[in-house]
Amino acid sequence: MSVEEKARIGNSEEPIIIETGKYAKLTDGSVVVRQGGTAVLVTAVMSDEPITDVDFTPLAVDYRERASAYGRIPGGFTKREGKPTDREILVSRVIDRPIRPLFPEGFFHDVIITALTLSADDKYDPDVLAITGASAALHISRIPFEGPIAGVRVCRVNGEFVANPTYEQRKEADLDIVMAGTKDAIVMVEGGGKEIPEEVLADALFFGLDAIKEVIEAQERLREKVGKPKFEYQKVELPEDILKALEEECTPKILEAFNIKDKKERYSTLDKIVEEFIEAHQIPEELHFAVKYFYKKLESRLMREKVLKEGVRIDGRKPNEIRPIWIEVHPFERPHGNAIFTRGQTQAYVTVTLGTPDEALIIETIAEGEVFKRFMLHYSMPPFSVGEAKPWGPPRRREIGHGALAERAIEPLLPPEEEYPFIIRVVSDILESNGSTSMATVCGASLALFDAGVPMKDNKHVAGIAMGLILEKDRYVILSDILGDEDHLGDMDFKVAGTKDGITSVQMDIKVKGITKEIMLDALKQAREGRLYILEKMYEAIPEPRKEPHPYTPKVEVVDVPEEKAPLIIGPGGSTVKKIYDETGVKVWVGEQGKVYLFVFPGGDVEKAKQMIQDIVREVEVGAVYKGTITRVEPYGVFVELWPGKIGLLHVSKMAEPVRSATEKYKVGEEIIVKVLDLDELGRPRFTTIGIEDVGTEKKEVKPKVGDVYEGKVVRVEPYGAFIEYAPGKVGLLHVSKMKERVKDARQKYKVGDVVKVKVVEIDEQGRPKFTDDV
């Protein structure tokens, strides 16, 4: 039986429709969520048996977009979808993050969420529909789930908040965030803006929370109609006497270990405490997992109490205290820009590489087809950064997500493409990790961009900070610059990046209900204070983008040419720009409105490249006579270069001495004097040798007149007439009809080499004389 529920989502143009009972019925729960012409199928499946030796819910989320949903055929050789794209991975993460904290403690069954885009229009993005679909599928299923939640995108367009805006509205927005929440609490935020004030972000979040209420109510109604009884899972249990002994014996040791500032030493000590307890009490092997599970819960509770009661954190810092910062700009010679940013035991080495427009990242997206990215930020966290002896594999989902977060933070400050045409690639390699590596990446990227001389907007640095929260009933403490432990054991992970003037990127995961607007504003205020402190340190290290780049950093110069002549610089198949690069080492990119960009790498001769471009666009005068060099010979004509880059065609029909094939008379490398007849549609000259005379290096034009008499030589004979060379390089036709002695075939009277006296009786439209031998 098919059942559907409909709900408005804030001030969005069209309602949300949630349908179940028609598709994918063998799953534990499945729904189709629609808005406009966009539809997403979301399924939830759970394993019957729990996974052993894990202390978390083994959740996996897989979001996929089919090209058919957009009416497209995938590109590539196979013409089928392949491994998940970055876009699919990022959407999978925003589905995963809000639902993961809502599985009950001790639930260790495999849960697989799959979202498949069935249809996609040109108005609504499927991503937020997939978040709502994941919640609805779980809510109506047997799978234990403390939802429902709903997803919404909030944008600010012309100063007004819009829920689930269209693609066109998003283009005009200065704030674009995806968020998810329960009926009364925000649980996840992901997005960014153009230096947005903290108060505006807070207002947007609570606008979004209000917008999703009807969608959550629709899910409740759906469960009332078709919901399955929830699965009774086996909870983790431990005998009371062991649990009591664990708390009494381990509490003082854990508190003492919290005072150890070094991460590796603290982790090792905490692990040793529980191992010694198990050994001392001879705990049976089947209870080892339960002991460690409750030990972790004890560790979390003690850490939280220490912060709430004493205002002191694991490493001894105050709640708003930031770890010591150490910065090194351009530590290594060859990268175009590079910097080390260290905060406590978190360290990022960030490089900037500048490239030419042909090195842009081309992404085939399902919605938009090919997209060219001029800015890329890639984040990498090798195992050695946490002291693990593991091989370094390909990027994982977490790394792709962290890179996207940092990329979003930096991008609004980049110079416009027309002012700074370089392709920019930033790479962050995490060398040490103890929390907040994505925010260290933001800081390191900003420093490295300054080092590379990238003219960031208003010379502004971008800094990031990760905030945490400990919340117990009516007490809460906000933590600045959190450690890895505080992330895992706290109630909120709130990453904020931006400039001194506002927020450019935000990511928030909240594990508890009850985050009020007051708490949110306090967290944003404390984050701003921390961000300003970090920015101060960054400006001390490098106050503005370098005016003079390093020796190995490429430079760019701009040459303006007439827009209609720009294709000449490219040349057929890019041959001209390739020639310039081969001869000068300068890469040429032809932009819009006659802008030609010269990318100068070490060893490049930019002055020579400029001269070559000036020669290419230099005007030739129609009717003028020039000396050139033959660069290519074809049967139909020869290509003559007047100066570097200025090449035109001398067609056989425009030659003073008619020939069947130009290869009979001309060779590559020969000099030739030509007259410009006209220009083709691309501005390339077309030549003739008719009516000009080569006298040494002088260019003397000869114009025969009717009545002139010449003594010439026969250079070619055809049945219809003889071609007479009446002066060096100048030929005219003696037609059989103009011969004094009438013949049917000129070959009956003349042969090549004969000397004949002729008179001009006519000048054709191309300036060539026609003769008679009746003199």
UniProtKB/Swiss-Prot annotation:
Cofactors demanded by this protein: Mg(2+)
Keywords: Cytoplasm, Magnesium, Metal-binding, Nucleotidyltransferase, Repeat, RNA-binding, Transferase
Catalytic reaction equation(s): RNA(n+1) + phosphate = RNA(n) + a ribonucleoside 5'-diphosphate
Compartments where found: Cytoplasm
Keyword DNA damage: no
GO molecular function, one term: magnesium ion binding
GO cellular component: cytosol
Major localization listed first in the record, in broad terms: cytoplasm
GO BP, sorted A to Z: mRNA catabolic process; RNA catabolic process; RNA processing
Family according to the record: Belongs to the polyribonucleotide nucleotidyltransferase family.
HAMAP family: PNPase
Described function: Involved in mRNA degradation. Catalyzes the phosphorolysis of single-stranded polyribonucleotides processively in the 3'- to 5'-direction.
Descriptive protein name: Polyribonucleotide nucleotidyltransferase
Annotated source species: Aquifex aeolicus (strain VF5)
Taxonomic path: Bacteria, Pseudomonadati, Aquificota, Aquificia, Aquificales
Gene giving rise to this polypeptide: pnp
